[in-house]
Amino acid sequence: MPVKKQTPPAYIGFGMLTPVYIMSLDRLPKLNTGAIVHEVSDYVYDDAAIIACNLSQWGVPSAMIGTAVGEDMLGRHVATTLKKLGVQGKVRFTDQYKTPLEVNVSDKQGARTYFWQRTPQILGTLDTADLSLIKRSKLLYVDWYDGDHIVRAMEEAKKHNVPVFLNFEHGHTHNDLLKKYAELVTVCQAVTDAAQIGKKQAMLGTARKLIKAGIQTAIITMASQGCMVLQGEEIVRAYAPRVKTVDASGAGATFSSGYIYGYLQGWDMEQTVRFAIAAASLKVTRIGLEMFPVQEVLGVARTIRIERMVYRGDQFHVIRKFLRLPRLNPVINMNNALMKQGQKFAERILPKKKMDRRKIKKSLVE
């Protein structure tokens, strides 16, 4: 029987491969005490692998070029999980170390505490990984915390004119790293600081720093406060909807997944940002990383509050604010039946706004 040809991957993730156990509880216990775990789920981390798995669930051909895993039960679990989710790429095995394990603890306040194993020996296996999948792809994703091991992959992508998405987090505070990576990066996702507590001015300052370094698209994420994306003169500030948080682990990678999905679909920046925020917001409402269907994400995306600005003369200017997408937006009208279904889902999952009693009294008088 002839072997069925696979569609070349549009997305390539490059980085660590590790199984993870995610535990959901009410709040982290005090030192030397315990807590009841409500639910446990497992997945494949780190962020590059999360995104590959997420995009595969949305029907995007994806592949992973990762670190070697041990010849053990956990290593085989990683390979089996990736194959089951349709993620392409060869998983390499080694007898030099055991497969690393990550444990994430998520509480209802939206915090997540993680415990991971990342040794130079494990990360060093990235230096011998086969990069041949990159040249036929449409986007390469790398994480800054994998260190200089990512440079080889980024240079390979640049050689073949493949855009590079860098998850830089707070790495931009190291000017030497920013200078080194800027010429290789197309899209850069960052946070204002390690704790993500910066306000609007910090977001603007971080975006300005990345653009001035030569990066084409700067994404600044602010956890529950949403994000800001700057590309050329265009700026979109999106506010995350209020949702009941169950598990925040993987939310940042799910945002990246949503942004990359829109990018690969050829959507404009606002449509892409809406989808990314909606996907991340929905992800935290349940444990694990089973993605919501695209039409349901689009339903929530329509409700995202947006502020538009322009960047001219080294200054930021607000041009308009609105709550809903224009009626003629192609994302809304791509399939009326699906969009109606998505809107109903959004109405069900998002909290209803409370009516102001003062407005009620005024309307009765009028």
What are these regions, as identified by a protein language model?
Residues 2-12, 203-366:
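Conserved phosphate-binding/catalytic region of the ribokinase-like
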Residues 7-8, 31-37, 57-138, 300-364:
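Conserved N-terminal subdomain of the carbohydrate kinase-like
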Residues 33-44, 246:
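A short acidic, glycine-rich active-site loop
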